[in-house]
Each structure stands twice: as C-alpha cells, then as structure tokens.
Amino acid sequence: MSKIENIRTILLSAEYGDEKHPEILECFPNGPKRTIGLVEVTLENGVKGYGEGYLGVFAPQVFKSIVELCAPYLVGKDGFDILRRYKDLCSICDYWSLQGAARHTTSAIEIALVDAKSKTQKCPAYKLFGNSTKDKIEVYGSGGICDTKEHFIEELELLKKLGIKKYKIRAVPSDINKTAWILKEARKYEIDIGIDMCQNLADPPIDADDVMNYIK
C-alpha cells in the first residue's frame, strides 16, 4: 500500500503537422500545433505515475479543471487499490458525464495509478493485469483525414517507409467511394485498412445495420 500524496495536471504543446493538411484545417482551428494533457500522480513513497487523457488535445483547460475536481477525493487514499480509486472517480463524475469529457480524465488518472504502481513494484505495467504470451504488439498508422488522393498516397508512403502494415482511416457513410479507392490503393503497398466509422462525430449515430451495409 502507498497513499496518494498529490495529483496535478501537466499540459504540453508542440508544433504538429502541416498548416495546409486537411486534418489541421478541419480539426485544429488554432493552426498546426497540438496540446496533450497528462495527469501526474505522486505516491507517498515518492514514485510518480503519468497518464494521458485525449480530452487534453481539444479542451486542455476543461481537462485540467476535471482533474482538480477529482483530486481531493483521491489524495490520502491507497494508490495501489486501482479498482477502488476508479470507482471513486465514477461516483464523482458518472451522474453528469457517464461518457465524454470525464471519461477521458478518469482514464488518465487510472493510467497514472497503474504507472506508479508498476514503477513501485519494478515490473512492466502489463504484469499488473496478468502475464503475456506475446513479446510484441503490431502497431498501426492512424490517419485518413485526406481530401485528395495525393494526401492518401503521402500517408501510405510514410507507412511503407516505417514498415507499418496496417492503416486506420476515418469514414462516414457518404465516404463510400473514397473508402473503396483507398482499399484498392493500399493493396499496392501491401497495407491492410481498418475503417473507423467516426461514431463520435455522427449525429444522429450510425446504427449497426448502416455499418454492415457500408462494409458490404
């Protein structure tokens, strides 16, 4: 057991992408830079753990505020009882944010606790969840916010250069022709395509039948 001594937010910003790239134009109104939000948990034994919350990319001050809301309910409690601390966070946030912003923050704090516990026990974090039968995990490239074929080819070329064999693209039902083209184009690079139907951007939500029809 090691009690939680302090919880704080760390916000970091850096240059990101090209100002004319479709992803920057569509998703980053402040231009080609990106912010990430981290939670730092300090245990009474002096060990610090870190976890990232994706909310920090888009609403860093909101992320910081939710961390500050939750921190007093966790400080002084056992940082090794991660499930109990997760339930504490749910009791604080579930009523007003069962999904969305608070979930990003809850996740970041939970990751930080896992990091701190694994460092204290001097073992890889995955061993806290049981052992592993694999010594490596295949990575994939995440992209596909492309308005032109040239942008898609640019991303495929980069993945090929890096030796990455899987490429996740984003799509909505109206993108069917673009998706069909990239599936065919990716074969030239021996790259497999995964399709993210962007459910978080769909209003109204895309139902399962629509997704199945899209795949067919």
Locations of regions flagged by a protein language model:
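Glycine-rich, aromatic-flanked loop segments that form ligand/cofactor-binding clefts
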Residues: 106, 110-146
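Metal- or metallocofactor-binding catalytic centers and their adjacent structured scaffolds
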Residues: 42-120
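Short glycine/serine/threonine/alanine-rich loop segments
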Residues: 76, 123, 191
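Metal-dependent enolase-superfamily TIM-barrel catalytic cores that perform enediolate-based chemistry
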Residues: 130-216
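Conserved active-site and cofactor/substrate-binding residues in soluble primary-metabolism enzymes
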Residues: 33-34, 61, 65, 80, ...
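Structured beta-strand/loop patches that form or line metal/cofactor-binding pockets in enzymes
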Residues: 1-45, 54
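Residues at beta-strand starts and edge strands
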Residues: 35-37, 68, 137
